[in-house]
């Protein structure tokens, strides 16, 4: 092989190696899915089934909001119903309060509202190997949506800044679920 051909082969190999290195540098453990598709973060799979505003004056919704005050003027309760599966061989924990938020296109964020509802997803709780939340024998699993919910207090006009995303950090990985509102 001539010197010019060797240089061309070496240049092509160097370019390919550089491109691979640059691509790997930007690689993050973040993914985005749409509501209804599972978001895989480590061993946990998060699947949002339904997102909707809750009305404290509605009979069904009042059960979800039991013990909570009526939202202040200009704000609404937003419920994100989901199930979570631990697809791993070991027990793990759900993300904590500070690892879950709803964000709109302006960057405005809302953190989960603490609730004692039987239907609520209890952040930070353990989930056994192969386990699923809600558990089969729970109120959330037998409820109308058959999922546990996270509750957020958001401004009334938040739908003007769609899409909203549920952002989750879990065990060193990050992802987002685009909510269907």
Range-by-range predicted roles:
Residues 1-12:
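Bacterial N-terminal signal peptides that target proteins for export
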Residues 2-4, 18-21, 25-181:
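Conserved functional micro-motifs across diverse proteins
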